[in-house]
């Protein structure tokens, strides 16, 4: 049995945190492959190393001196090395980084050095092999992740190492230049390594004890979810819930590898299990609540819309022509509403409206701005009557007007539209009725 373990930036921010990570890895001999992030914040006003690297490279790109900034980054890593009492010298690595910064090697290269250097320290600390992600994780000429090549090369390389560290966040282009995943991409690297290693479990260690039912910035001390399916997690991640990068779900989902989200600062907690399917009933009717602000709705009306073949396609074509993706499209007999990101839409709204008139000839178009979408997700909703009614009741009790409700055919989620100003109150009301009072 083997486990791939990924540790986030907060778990590796200092030597003290490194020691916790070392104890966790050594406590289970099945934790054979480690994916580290760059050092995060040591305290609330601290700066993440990735952000320090971005700022440092920005000066280099402008042809300005970046010595002080690079020295500060060196000091962060040296503090960790000294705290772990390692005989490790990164000076040659920093000479290469300085040279490449002066050669304007790009933001992707700059950002990736945080994980790269942390990986070297981690491998030295654990006595594991170090595998530079640029040699085993690949992107194609269009900058898209090359899953087939990566899996083949990485699987062969891991077979040569019983225990290894693979830095997160980056890989390489066909010409050898470094390319990063989107922010939070170390989660993706961990998933890719788990797939290539044919791991039994992918452990994702962070600073929370699992995936929470709701955003702790809105709900005080929300409960952790014990078990959640990939489909549920995908719905919640898409609607803004954070802990695991949404693209990290797919590689392990394909292989049926479960993910266990754990807390570095509380390793005794079981965390959250993310699985393909389960016979376990969720503790509550809902599994989680998530949402985003900043949407607007484009409401289109036309008599006899339901009998006009291709009407919806024509409307959506107007959005496509302007490079705007939609979030949800609830509809009635003579009405159709398209929800889009407001910041994406506002600069092109008149072009889109003109396009809808040209393509679909509607009777009326009305635009409403400053809306929020909330997803209530749970496999338990399918077998429970009255879930939507309870949501309406909770929101009505708080005098919140529901702008839209849309339930997927799978009955896995219900999407509610409310005003931006009602967003936090709405989430509190929904959490209260399903988790606290359970009315």
How would you name each of these model-derived features?
Residues 1-244, 249, 417-419, 438:
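Nucleotide/pyrophosphate-binding catalytic subdomain
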Residues 2-3, 31-34, 128-129, 162-165, ...:
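Structural motif
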Residues 124, 262-264:
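Internal glycine-rich alpha/beta core junctions
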Residues 244-246, 255, 265-272, 346-349:
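Surface-exposed amphipathic alpha-helical tracts and adjacent flexible/coil segments at the periphery
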Residues 270-439:
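A conserved regulatory-domain signal marking ACT and ACT-like small-molecule sensing domains
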């Amino acid at each position: 049995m083997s486990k791939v373990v990924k540790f986030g930036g907060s778990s590796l921010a200092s030597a003290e945190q490194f020691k916790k990570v070392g104890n966790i890895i050594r406590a289970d001999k099945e934790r054979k492959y480690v994916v580290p992030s760059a050092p995060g914040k040591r305290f609330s006003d601290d700066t993440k190393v990735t952000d320090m690297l971005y700022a440092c490279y920005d000066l280099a790109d402008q042809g300005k001196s970046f010595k002080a900034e690079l020295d500060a980054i060196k000091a962060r890593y040296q503090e960790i090395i000294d705290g772990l009492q390692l005989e490790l010298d990164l000076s040659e690595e920093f000479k290469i980084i300085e040279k490449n910064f002066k050669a304007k090697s790009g933001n992707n290269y700059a950002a990736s050095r945080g994980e790269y250097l942390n990986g070297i320290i981690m491998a030295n600390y654990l006595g594991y092999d170090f595998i530079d992600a640029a040699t085993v994780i690949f992107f194609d000429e269009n900058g898209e992740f090359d899953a087939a090549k990566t899996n083949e090369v990485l699987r062969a390389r891991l077979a040569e190492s019983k225990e290894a560290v693979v830095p997160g966040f980056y890989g390489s282009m066909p010409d050898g230049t470094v390319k990063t995943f989107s922010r939070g991409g170390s989660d993706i690297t961990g998933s890719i390594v788990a797939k290539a290693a044919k791991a039994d479990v992918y452990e994702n260690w962070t600073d929370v004890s699992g995936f929470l039912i709701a955003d702790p910035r809105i709900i005080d001390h929300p409960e952790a979810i014990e078990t959640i399916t990939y489909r549920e997690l995908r719905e919640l991640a898409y609607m803004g819930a954070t802990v695991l990068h949404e693209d990290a779900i797919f590689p392990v989902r394909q292989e049926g590898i479960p993910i266990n989200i754990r807390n570095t600062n509380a390793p005794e907690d079981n965390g959250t299990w993310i699985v393909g399917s389960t016979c376990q009933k969720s503790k509550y009717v809902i599994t989680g609540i998530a949402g985003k602000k900043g949407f607007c709705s484009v409401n289109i009306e036309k008599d006899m819309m339901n009998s006009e073949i291709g009407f919806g396609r024509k409307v959506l074509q107007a959005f496509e022509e302007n490079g705007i993706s939609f979030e949800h499209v609830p509809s009635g007999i003579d009405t159709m509403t398209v929800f889009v990101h407001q910041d994406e839409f506002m600069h092109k709204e008149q072009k889109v409206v003109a396009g809808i008139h040209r393509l679909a000839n509607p009777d009326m178009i009305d635009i409403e701005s400053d809306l929020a979408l909330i997803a209530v997700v749970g496999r338990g909703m399918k077998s429970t009557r009255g879930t939507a009614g309870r949501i309406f009741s909770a929101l009505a009790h708080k005098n919140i007007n529901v702008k839209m409700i849309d339930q997927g055919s799978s009955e896995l989620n219900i999407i509610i539209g409310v005003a931006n100003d009602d967003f936090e109150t709405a989430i509190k009301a929904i959490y209260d009725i399903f988790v606290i009072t359970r009315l």
